[in-house]
């Protein structure tokens, strides 16, 4: 519900001044809407004299192109976000399956590496005892540091030891096999 003219007044102005300015502001709002209707009527009649700006470039055509570009950009963003959301959901669903499948392989490799490191630790301690007593060279397994560097997790899990389905090539791990042969 709109206030009546009598209700509109300002403390610093008389009622007649307030009413007059209110009428002007209300009439501005009314005429503002009619401009859009006139433009549509001109367009419907085929009167396109206002379609060009002073440079001769079509302003309505520019507006349509700008709107089209904006819509294309919005559509592109929505498609991209939908793709990203779908990919994330798929990864979440399959992450547990992949973990369950590869866990036993990783655990087996970890146990083998742990045994090799334990042997290297024992051999390193024995080598140190032999060196202290006789100055001898010791075991072929090498030092603990050498074994730890060679059997680092990033080297053990290098893709060159796995096929496309992340299974061990030929059922054996080349690096671990090499160190197992050294320890025997």
Swiss-Prot record:
Q: Where is the composition biased (Basic and acidic residues)?
A: 43-54
Biased composition of type Polar residues is found at: 12-25, 59-68
Q: Where is the composition biased (Acidic residues)?
A: 29-42
**Spans annotated as deca-GX3 motif:** 82-122
Location comes to: Cytoplasm; Nucleus
Q: List every stretch annotated Disordered.
A: 1-68
Tell me yes or no: is Nuclease among this UniProt entry's keywords.
Answer: no
Cite the entry's keywords alphabetically.
Cytoplasm, Nucleus
According to its UniProt entry, one GO biological process term is: protein maturation
Q: Which InterPro entries match?
A: Essential_protein_Yae1_N
Q: In its keyword annotation, does this UniProt entry include Chloroplast? A: no
Gene Ontology cellular component list: cytoplasm; nucleus
Instruction: Give the UniProt family note.
Output: Belongs to the YAE1 family.
Q: What does this protein do?
A: The complex LTO1:YAE1 may function as a target specific adapter that probably recruits apo-RPLI1 to the cytosolic iron-sulfur protein assembly (CIA) complex machinery. May be required for biogenesis of the large ribosomal subunit and initiation of translation.
Q: How does it assemble?
A: May form a complex with LTO1.
Q: What is this protein called?
A: Protein YAE1
Which organism was this protein described from?
A: Lodderomyces elongisporus (strain ATCC 11503 / CBS 2605 / JCM 1781 / NBRC 1676 / NRRL YB-4239)
């Amino acid at each position: 519900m709109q206030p009546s003219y009598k209700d509109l007044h300002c403390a610093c102005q008389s009622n007649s001044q307030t009413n007059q300015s209110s009428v002007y502001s209300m009439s501005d709002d009314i005429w503002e809407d009619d401009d859009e209707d006139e433009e549509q009527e001109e367009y419907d009649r085929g009167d396109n004299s206002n379609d060009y700006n002073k440079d001769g470039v079509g302003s309505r055509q520019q507006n349509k192109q700008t709107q089209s570009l904006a819509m294309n950009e919005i559509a592109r963003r929505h498609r991209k976000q939908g793709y990203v959301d779908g990919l994330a959901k798929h990864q979440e669903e399959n992450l547990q399956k992949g973990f369950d499948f590869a866990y036993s392989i990783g655990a087996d490799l970890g146990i083998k590496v742990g045994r090799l490191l334990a042997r290297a630790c024992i051999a390193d301690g024995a080598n140190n005892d032999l060196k202290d007593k006789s100055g001898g060279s010791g075991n072929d397994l090498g030092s603990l540091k050498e074994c730890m560097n060679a059997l680092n997790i990033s080297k053990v899990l290098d893709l060159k030891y796995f096929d496309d389905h992340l299974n061990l090539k030929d059922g054996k791990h080349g690096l671990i096999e090499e160190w197992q042969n050294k320890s025997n």
